[in-house]
Amino acid sequence: MRLFIMAMLVIPSTALAGWSLYEIFLPNGLTNLEIAQLGLGLTLFAWLCMAFWTGIIGFFLQLFNIDPLSLRRIQAQPDSATPLGQKHAVVMPVYNEDTRRIMVGFEACIRELMDSDNSAQFDFYMLSDTRDMAKADAELRAFTRLKKRLGGYSSQVFYRRREKNLHRKVGNLKEFCERWGANYESMIVLDADSVMTGERMQDLARRIEQNPDTALVQTIPMPVRQNTFFGRFVQFAAHLYSPMLATGLSFWQTDSANYWGHNAIIRIAPFMQHCGLPTLEGRAPFGGEILSHDFVEAALLRRAGWQAYLLTDTTGSYEEVPSNIVDYAIRDRRWVQ
């Protein structure tokens, strides 16, 4: 029903925008180029209209303090009084990153949980695919120093570097799951520039343990630590509209939310069972490795009958974003074949 409502909002809006563009082209007749422009325009209008109505729905749900899933005033929360009963892994895949930055973020997450009542239920893994030998050596030295600083808790912190980084990040996580996944109920996946509070990590683990039909909970990672005008502007914009968009997305996605590749918790057993990705036949861009693997993995979990949710509470989950438009373009090229 919610998807139908969303479609009834998006389709007429897109049609109206497309008709307006058509009327601009019409007086002098339509050329082949203008027909192509009209087709591309309709595609972009649909995308924009979907974001617009998602934001509008989220705005009113937040305005009246209504939970986007239950549509009630009180949002369901996991029972925080019950201690965690399963083991969970916090994994950070890295590839040729700035060693100091990743170690600072990694240690911050560890220390967030060290003194908690559930500290024994979490293990931490830095999963390195670094090819630059100088950076790989720096990672190992920094990790050795980290273990010394952590004292007794260091027995729950691990570093692994693959000799061959087959299948990029997908292969990195796959190897972790095959080697150690059976020891854990779930894994919290962080990016190299991610940070998560101890309370948020415990909250995610509770949601997995207390909802046996749920395989994925995606948080909203909020941008932090920006000091350029561009970076601060992006950070401000995200803090302004992310709560509305997240609430709107949760309203119409319900238990079929997307996976963004990081700052999320995944139940390991169904992930291993259903989310093996093939190498597509043919030449790029339609063949080869699936680059936006996270979207596909969420769809595979949902197809197998597992639930996936977007957590609309934006506290406790953070990431860094590129500080200028050039770095943004470089990052976006990762998904271009």
Question: What is the meaning of each model-derived region?
Answer:
Residues 1-82:
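N-terminal membrane-anchoring/stem segments of glycan-assembly enzymes
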Residues 53-56, 60-337:
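Internal catalytic domains of large membrane-associated glycosyltransferases
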